[in-house]
């Protein structure tokens, strides 16, 4: 009956006409999403990384990932965001120095990778393949990235597993993919 109202006969032989009609009459114009790339979404709040302001979570603030942590916005309302120059965490700086062998360009890359993990854009998928001798910090690096984005957004796999049929299904919708 519905097909008849659309002006199409509802016989099984008319399936192609129906599909063509649906494809041409119900087009949705897709455009670029208005995405604010300088936010990090938590369970209970949104952090604007440019202004340092913490705001209440709203579905209007689109983001493809949400970190599984509470910021505690009620506790932060009256506390101004500190402006700390240089490195924020001496322990992380020490880890970076040992992990990169003190190479500044590699440190910048690692920081950029972590920054990219936390960004709210979905323009590219993140993939990092690490290789090296045992005891050089690959697992620690992997754990740090997992803590940053949450275990639900992380996938640990091997290249051999990804080469199997349906291997890429493991990494679908994951923010962080670690191959060892």
From Swiss-Prot:
<keyword id="KW-0496">Mitochondrion</keyword>
<dbReference type="GO" id="GO:0005739">
    <property type="term" value="C:mitochondrion"/>
</dbReference>
<protein>
    <recommendedName>
        <fullName>Uncharacterized mitochondrial protein ymf21</fullName>
    </recommendedName>
</protein>
């Amino acid at each position: 009956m519905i097909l008849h109202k659309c002006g199409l006969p509802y016989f099984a032989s008319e399936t192609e006409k129906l599909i063509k009609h649906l494809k041409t009459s119900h087009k949705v114009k897709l455009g670029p999403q208005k995405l604010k790339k300088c936010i990090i979404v938590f369970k209970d709040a949104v952090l604007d990384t440019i202004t340092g302001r913490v705001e209440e979570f709203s579905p209007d603030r689109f983001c493809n990932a949400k970190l599984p942590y509470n910021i505690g916005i009620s506790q932060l309302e009256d506390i101004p965001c500190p402006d700390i120059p240089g490195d924020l965490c001496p322990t992380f700086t020490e880890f970076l120095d040992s992990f990169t062998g003190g190479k500044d360009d590699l440190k910048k890359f690692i920081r950029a990778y972590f920054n990219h993990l936390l960004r709210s854009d979905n323009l590219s998928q993140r993939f990092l393949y690490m290789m090296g001798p045992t005891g050089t910090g690959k697992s620690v690096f992997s754990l740090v990235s997992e803590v940053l984005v949450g275990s639900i957004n992380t996938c640990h796999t091997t290249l051999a597993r990804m080469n199997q049929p349906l291997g890429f299904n493991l990494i679908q919708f994951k923010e962080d993919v670690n191959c060892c």
